Regions:
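Hydrophobic, well-ordered beta-alpha structural blocks that scaffold small-molecule cofactor pockets
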Residues: 11-82
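Residue-level detector of alpha-helix initiation sites
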Residues: 52-53, 114-115, 161
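Short acidic/histidine-rich motifs immediately flanking catalytic phosphotransfer sites
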Residues: 86, 101-106
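Conserved SAM/SAH-binding loop
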Residues: 93-97
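ADP-ribose/adenylate-binding Rossmann-like module
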Residues: 106-112, 117-144
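An accessory alpha-helical subdomain
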Residues: 161-256
Length: 256
């Protein structure tokens, strides 16, 4: 939805001249966003709007174990199915104001009604709540990057709201470059985090241990990549690489 639709209606850039000169959108490009990963497990997340975009946002929240409530008089058939199976709670009605946000951690407005979107944003802002109005950067205090996700590996791509289409293109390109070998390496390294904390007494020693493996020769990513489909030969080679690093660092600690 274009930013012009919000002119004179509490637009965050405070332009009430009958038109919006896009200053509010430009301001998003200059905003130094703080990038973080949110743990949504057990947290109430609200989506207002039950169309295709609402479905996309609901599925993203469900993928992160959010407790999702949908408010919409009508909903996409897939959302209806989610409600019937108990995956989400669907309140089949219009947005009712600030009371709908009670106990909510995050709200996403995905309607085609300008007034509803403005109301959701204003109500959430007054409660210092995370709020995103889809495709209207001025009415967001957080934005949703495109995500490349493989196993425990997640890569976020953001254009600060300037071009979601560009972010999606970058996502496709990154998916081809960083895939299963990187995700598998993350799992293998996680397996020895406990050993590292129990054996290597300082942060610097643990840092050198892990960085030595990740940036070492032979390259563990290339070992995993070359061993894909070869009865786990790549993974076995990386396990041996890690074991060698463990022995070397444990020896250094014993001599200290």
């Amino acid at each position: 939805m274009p930013a012009q639709a919000y002119a004179g209606k509490e637009c965050v850039c405070q332009l009430r001249r009958g038109i919006c000169d896009q200053s509010c959108v430009q301001g998003m490009l200059d905003t130094p966003f703080y990038i973080a990963c949110l743990k949504l497990t057990g947290r109430r997340c609200l989506v207002v709007g039950g169309g295709e975009i609402g479905l996309e946002k609901v599925e993203g929240l469900l993928a992160c174990d959010g407790e999702v409530t949908l408010i919409a008089p009508h909903a996409h058939e897939t959302l209806v199915a989610y409600a019937r199976e108990g995956s989400i709670r669907w309140e089949q009605r219009e947005y009712g104001g600030a009371a709908d946000l009670e106990g909510v951690f995050m709200v996403i407005a995905a309607t085609d009604d300008t007034d509803v979107n403005i109301a959701v944003f204003a109500d959430a802002e007054r409660q210092a709540m995370l709020v995103n109005v889809v495709d209207v950067p001025p009415l967001c205090n957080f934005i949703l990057p495109a995500i490349v996700r493989t196993g425990p590996l997640a890569i976020a791509i953001s254009t600060a709201g300037a071009s979601p289409a560009l972010a999606k293109r970058m996502k496709r390109e990154i998916e081809g470059q960083f895939g299963a070998p990187y995700a598998r390496l993350a799992v293998l390294l996680n397996e020895v985090r406990g050993w590292a904390k129990g054996t290597l007494p300082t942060y610097q020693e643990r840092k050198e241990f892990f960085e030595g493996i990740v940036n070492g020769d032979p390259d563990p990513v290339e070992l995993l990549r070359s061993g894909e489909g070869a009865e786990g030969t790549g993974e076995q080679a990386v396990r041996e690489l890690i074991a060698q690093a463990q022995s070397a660092h444990a020896l250094q600690v014993s001599r200290a």
